[in-house]
Structure formats: structure tokens, C-alpha cells
Amino acid sequence: ALAGSDDHILAGIEKSAMDAALIKQSYTSDRTMEVVLESTLFGGFLQLVLPEEIKSIPTLQILDPPAVLEKKSSEYTGLIIDATAIEFYPVLYPVVISELGSEIYSALFISREIAVQQGVCRYVCAMDSVDTVRWVGENPISVKALRTGGPGNSSIVISRSDADIIEKTRERHRFMRECRVIILVSQTPNDQAQ
């Protein structure tokens, strides 16, 4: 519905399809051809489909008192949301809200440039990859998802106490701006297709 209503978006999606790699081509018994293409979601495609609310955010420099110039070991470096206990399926633009409905992670906190290049978050089934651990750093905040919400169940609801911890974390603006958020899911779409 979104692509059909905007010729610019439709043209961009068509260009992405033209640039995609052919993965599989087969013919069915009724003489139709089935084609599977593979393309990256990052870059131009995300630039087209991410909502306009995700804007460029200037880099904020958090100033520490002169005596404390080195990074504190207690400083949080990212956010991990465990959504394995709920039926949440990956979406391009997830929103995290508290039980009271306040937005904890949304367009307000995300830099468009970073989201376009790297995605709004990363979805994983296990925290065993070095890249995954590197993405959220050595000291991420970990929270559990309570349930889904919002249109199409594209929002994750977390507890008030977890939301309070995140909101009181000074460095959250830095790691959220950089989209250093991982959502742990029970299955990714690739796992479901197999």
C-alpha cells in the first residue's frame, strides 16, 4: 500500500529489484516462472521506506568533569531486548514502549544516516556471535519484552522498571542514536523459511 501510493518509492523499489542478485529461477507446472532475488535492505532501500520521523540527529558530545575523562566501566554501551518469550516478528522499524505507553526507542532517538547504513536494530536468535557482542559493546542494558503492541504488533512493550533504568541512563542517547540495539527473537524470517 505504501509503495503503490508514492511513485518515488515504487521507482526506488524497482531499481533495488533490478540491482538484486538472482538466487533461484524455476518454472512451475503451469508454465509460470518463479524467481528469487537477493538484495540488501541497507542504503537506498531503507532511505526510501524508513518513516520521515527518523531524522538526522547531530552528534552530541557528553561532557564529563575534567577529572573523569576516561570511559567509566559502568557506562552502558547498547541495549539488548529479549523478545524470545513473546510472538514478535522482525520489522524494519520496531518501536520499544513502556507499559505506560511512553516511547523508549523510536524515531526520536535514531539517526537517519546510521539507520539507513546499518538498520534500526539487529535481530538475532542467539548472543553467541562476536559481531553481535561487538555491536552492543561490553556493557549493554538487557531487558525482557512483556508483549507486543502497536499497529501490526510492531512495537515491543517492556516493564516500567526496565524503562526507568533506560531513561535514567545518560549515555542512552549515544547508543540509541547509533542504533546499537539488538532484539533477541526465537526465530528470524530466514529460519522460518527453511
Language model features by range: what are they?
Residues A1-Q194:
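Domain-level marker for long, solvent-exposed, non-transmembrane regions
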